[in-house]
């Protein structure tokens, strides 16, 4: 496995709609493995393939409930609204308040090509929406209010 450099704000791939994955092969499996390793190395809770320069509809998320991998994810339903602070590995040091659905259902494929349906609420729902936005070329700062620099805590 490998840790990839995370693409940052200003790279045009972050503004493009990622391409559907027509077939799951060894390259996609390797991509999933490398994305997870990159996400954990960066201490993130989610990563979309465009964030490592790959235009594929692939995401990985781990909000402390275990690794969730999704290929070609689609949000099929949303309910409620919550506003909370978000940041992004591609926009280091910046946070903002984003309103998102509080409960969602997402359909996609797992690494074996089997259908996967996830019902998520709270932080997992927020992380999934954030990563799926990346697949559509949308950055959190486009939806955020009260955008601010993250001030490091002093020890």
Curated annotation (Swiss-Prot):
Keyword Iron: yes
Amino-acid positions noted as binding Fe cation in the UniProt annotation, renumbered to this chain: 88, 130, 134
Note accompanying the cofactor annotation: Binds 1 Fe(2+) ion.
GO biological processes: co-translational protein modification; translation
Keyword Aminoacyl-tRNA synthetase: no
Cofactor(s) required, per the database record: Fe(2+)
EC category: hydrolase
GO molecular function: metal ion binding; peptide deformylase activity
Domain of life: Bacteria
Gene3D superfamilies: Peptide deformylase
InterPro entries per the UniProt record, alphabetical: Peptide_deformylase, Peptide_deformylase_sf
Catalysis: reaction(s): N-terminal N-formyl-L-methionyl-[peptide] + H2O = N-terminal L-methionyl-[peptide] + formate
Entry EC no(s): 3.5.1.88
Catalytic residues in the record: 131
Record keywords: Hydrolase, Iron, Metal-binding, Protein biosynthesis
Function in brief: Removes the formyl group from the N-terminal Met of newly synthesized proteins. Requires at least a dipeptide for an efficient rate of reaction. N-terminal L-methionine is a prerequisite for activity but the enzyme has broad specificity at other positions.
Family indicated by similarity: Belongs to the polypeptide deformylase family.
The name this protein goes by in its record: Peptide deformylase
Organism per entry: Pelotomaculum thermopropionicum (strain DSM 13744 / JCM 10971 / SI)
